[in-house]
Swiss-Prot record:
NCBIfam families: PRK02542.1. Seems to be required for the assembly of the photosystem I complex. It comes from Physcomitrium patens. This is Photosystem I assembly protein Ycf4. Keywords: Chloroplast, Membrane, Photosynthesis, Plastid, Thylakoid, Transmembrane, Transmembrane helix.
Length: 184
């Protein structure tokens, strides 16, 4: 967490601009283009891309299916590239002791609700809750308990924090907000 002073705490949240998203978007784009061009090559009867042979593929039904998979892959790749470009999910958590307000801000998809901002008073915070699930896919999530509302997650679902890191993060935030820690 990034602590700026004794009364203000701002924690930046990483959105969809992650290395893994760039890799998946690129792999999906090149794979989809490969499928599409092999399908189109089977229609024309000659290879449009020299290293992708389509000589033994009939257009109906194999070429049509490959074109369909290529187009579907291009749509999925376009979606991933758009989320990366718009940086969906990025934002910050701001805890302001002077104004006694907590602001959670995230960027969404373009449109009417592009800016997602949730504000509430610090007096409504009941505590910090940790959820820890061990196993093949361990999940360690930090939540803020608010009076009369459901718990608000403060860490991303796929943020791989060790048990010590999540405990330290929870302790620092609970100390700053002067609330209790639950869970574990």
């Amino acid at each position: 967490m990034n602590r700026e002073s004794d009364w203000l705490w701002v924690e930046p949240i990483m959105g969809s601009r992650r290395v893994s998203n760039f890799c998946w978007a690129a792999i999906l784009l090149f794979g989809a283009l490969g499928f599409f061009f092999v399908g189109i090559s089977s229609y024309f009867g000659k290879d449009l891309i020299p290293f992708l042979s389509s000589q033994q593929i009939l257009f109906v039904p194999q070429g049509v299916v490959m074109c369909f998979y290529g187009i579907a892959g291009l749509f999925l790749s376009f979606y991933l590239w758009c989320t990366i470009f718009w940086n969906v999910g990025s934002g910050y958590n701001k805890f302001d002791k002077k104004k006694k307000i907590v602001s959670l801000f995230r960027w969404g998809f373009p449109g009417e609700n592009r800016r997602i901002c949730i504000n509430f008073f610090m007096k409504d915070i009941q505590g910090i809750r940790m959820e820890v699930q061990e196993g093949i896919y361990p999940r360690r999530t930090l939540y803020m308990k608010i009076k009369g509302q459901q718990d608000i997650p403060l860490t991303r679902i796929r943020e791989n924090l060790t048990l010590g890191e999540i405990e330290e993060k929870a302790a620092e935030l609970a100390r700053f907000l002067r609330v209790s820690i639950e869970g574990l």
